[in-house]
Amino acid sequence: SNNIVKEIRYIEYPNPSQDVIKKFLRDYIKWNFEEQAKLAAETFPNPTYEIIDEVVIVYYKVFINDQPPKLPLDHVDTLLSSFLFWEEQEFDTDNKKAKVKFEITNFRQDANVWVTWIVRDIGEGVLGHAHLGKGIVEVTLGDYNCDGSFQLYDVKSVETIMTHELGHSISLQHVTDQNNIMYASYTPSYAYCLLS
């Protein structure tokens, strides 16, 4: 017992998950588009397009919601990786080749897509939400499924969820191929949970 008193203990990598959820809950409306997500996507402007060398280029203007300061993981870079993933794809539509391009805007009213990261529960096993074709994209940063307390997903999981949800925002549906990013199911990994 005397040895325990003298023992110095520290945690090399403390789990910031609880601090993150507190940051999001302090100013709930600012960090969440919950009310806007209930509205119809028809209120968003349509993406624009042009045809270059017989390829339809569809332009999406994206508003990126602020995040609480000093989050432990970088999610904005995962969004940029998700943009790049879809911009590298070529689609067939109406017997024409099509590509997408994303442009970030600071003005919500100009955006076809609003992106935000959330910590609220959006349904059992639901990792994200997106309107089809235009509208809101919400990506959860964690859940309560690892050890019963809120735990953050790792960066790769958040990127995978974001890429999937952005796929919906450019009008892609779920597919049956389990190796496709648009497959309906995904099991995320945790950044800090000791039980994962």
Which role fits each region the language model picked out?
Residues 1-2, 194-196:
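Short, intrinsically disordered, charge-balanced linker/junction segments flanking boundaries
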Residues 2-73, 87:
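Disordered inhibitory propeptide/activation segment of secreted metzincin zinc metalloprotease zymogens
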Residues 65-69, 144-148, 188-189:
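A short, flexible beta-alpha/helix-coil linker loop
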Residues 173-195:
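Post-HEXXH active-site segment of zinc metalloproteases
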